[in-house]
Amino acid sequence: MALYIGVMSGTSLDGLDIALIEQSSAINLVATHYIPMPDTLRAELLGLCAGGPDEIARSAIAQQNWVKLAAQGIHTLLEQQQLKPEAIRAIGSHGQTIRHEPARGFTVQIGNPALLTELTGITVVSDFRSRDVAAGGQGAPLVPAFHEALFEERTGNRAVLNVGGFSNLSLIEPNKPVAGFDCGPGNVLMDAWIHQQRGENYDRNGQWAASGKVEPTLLKALLSDPFFVTQGPKSTGREVFNLPWLEQQLSCLPGFAAENVQATLLELTALTIVESLQSAQSNTEELLVCGGGAHNVTLMKRLADLLPNAKVASTATHGVDPDWVEAMAFAWLAHCCLEGIAANRPSVTGAKGLRVLGAIYPN
């Protein structure tokens, strides 16, 4: 039995998820801690994702601030659990993605793991995506292997859907290698639109989207992006889908009510998930949803409507808190790295083979 901490800061940039897991014959979530992202740091990270002048210095400063926030949260979690740093075998730190371009052979997550080791007194494993990209893979999604480890004992055809800033699927079917891929925007466009229009960070329960109606011409324009017809393995990010991308689509069309745009963005998320399942020829009997999207009542209902032959439910129905799956995954990936266990899945990322992921910063 060993204890690991996972730190995840996703594309939504709402905050840092910190999860403590116990790794033995099973994976158990022990405790969690969440730190909201300060507005100034969030704005700077968003700016780095978009690109601009003096990126090297700006990214160096931003990652120092990110690491200090992460270390603060880790110490708080340890204090709450009355644990000393020596009790933790390693921290799996994803860092913050500021650029993901596997077609050009690189992916960049900032997070200064050396400083995180110094500030916590705990070995840190980070840079999980680069090895898969170096092996010709997409470097994403990485969570399907973890989903497989969590749910491999279950029977039937199951898909695990993570809806964070972007949505990705893991297909777990008996006697088949796990499959997985990014579907497209999850919450990223809905969050950006409601923030621009109403100053809110997200659409609680999808209520604003539910107040509008889908605009077919806008939906058709959004779905015309080449990503949606690209065959997997594939991954995407803010480099492709962002507020300027949405505004460009809107500029070519007549004006729409703001709530109708939100409704259409939710429909885009739901449709691209379902079409991804269909293109994979998946006979999904159960769709388990995690990430922030699991709390979007309107999205969950729409997925259920579009998948009448599948049970659509939160991972909570299987005892796995939907808010902490990704942070748990990076704690588990740290375990895999230290044990020399390959944690990518070529059937998911397209890499040339199995690879041990992560770089180790020993305490």
Curated annotation (Swiss-Prot):
- Tell me which UniProt keywords the record has, alphabetically: ATP-binding, Carbohydrate metabolism, Kinase, Nucleotide-binding, Transferase
Give the EC number(s) under which this enzyme is classified. 2.7.1.170
Classify the source by domain of life.
Answer: Bacteria
Q: Which GO terms describe its biological process?
A: 1,6-anhydro-N-acetyl-beta-muramic acid catabolic process; amino sugar metabolic process; peptidoglycan turnover
Where ATP binds, per the record, is at: G10, T11, S12, L13, D14, G15, L16, D17
Listed pathway(s): Amino-sugar metabolism; 1,6-anhydro-N-acetylmuramate degradation; Cell wall biogenesis; peptidoglycan recycling
Looking up CDD domains in the UniProt record yields: ASKHA_NBD_ANMK
Q: Please name the GO terms that the record assigns under molecular function.
A: ATP binding; kinase activity; phosphotransferase activity, alcohol group as acceptor
Q: Which PANTHER family match?
A: ANHYDRO-N-ACETYLMURAMIC ACID KINASE (PTHR30605:SF0)
Check the record and name the HAMAP family matching this protein: AnhMurNAc_kinase
Q: Which family does it belong to?
A: Belongs to the anhydro-N-acetylmuramic acid kinase family.
Q: What exactly does this protein do?
A: Catalyzes the specific phosphorylation of 1,6-anhydro-N-acetylmuramic acid (anhMurNAc) with the simultaneous cleavage of the 1,6-anhydro ring, generating MurNAc-6-P. Is required for the utilization of anhMurNAc either imported from the medium or derived from its own cell wall murein, and thus plays a role in cell wall recycling.
Put simply, this protein is called Anhydro-N-acetylmuramic acid kinase
Lineage, top ranks: Bacteria, Pseudomonadati, Pseudomonadota, Gammaproteobacteria, Pseudomonadales
Gene of origin? anmK
